[in-house]
Amino acid sequence: CAMGKQAMGVYVTNYQERMDKTAYVLNYPTRPLVDTRLMNIIELMKIPSGTNVVVAIMSHTGYNQEDSLLFNKGSVDRGLFQATIYHTEKDEDKQKVNGEEEIRCKPDTTKTKGLKFANYNKINASGLVDENTLIENRDIIISKVTPIKENRNDPTKVVKYEDQSRVYRTNEDTYVDRNYLDRNGEGYTFAKVRLRAQRQPIFGDKFSSRH
């Protein structure tokens, strides 16, 4: 029962419209061969979890498999138990002590100090990365700057900026799935960037029977 609650599947029907911090969605869920009365009452078939597979219990090379599974590599390559991982990064604009507000944009390298050791090339004019763009390690996903002055007592001084961008670190192919901009209760804008990545079963993943 406990593992059934943790099973990967479709956790809500509107997951494509949500910006949850982290979400796991099974790409090809299937309904069980046998239904129960409770499953029909709570309409579990609308949010299925798990996949129907053919399981063989056998001795392998003369030794019994204990607490482990062997998968057909061809089935895994064709998408068996493949899942999509959604991860959301959130960034809120704030007002600094000097009264200046943060600006979400692509930094001007000639006027911005404190630039990160990262890739800014994928940032658009809004300070975000276009949807369905591949994100690699040390790419900037949310870019913004804070206006500063070299000398606060000199109003004629050229305004410069300090980088406040966010670097994304990953070791897998990740894409920008959706960008969302809005304002909070204080009137400041905030940005949410939902990222997605495809994953296949690897050593250490846990599986169980739902029957």
Would you name each region that the model predicts?
Residues C1-H211:
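Conduit-forming functional cores of very large proteins
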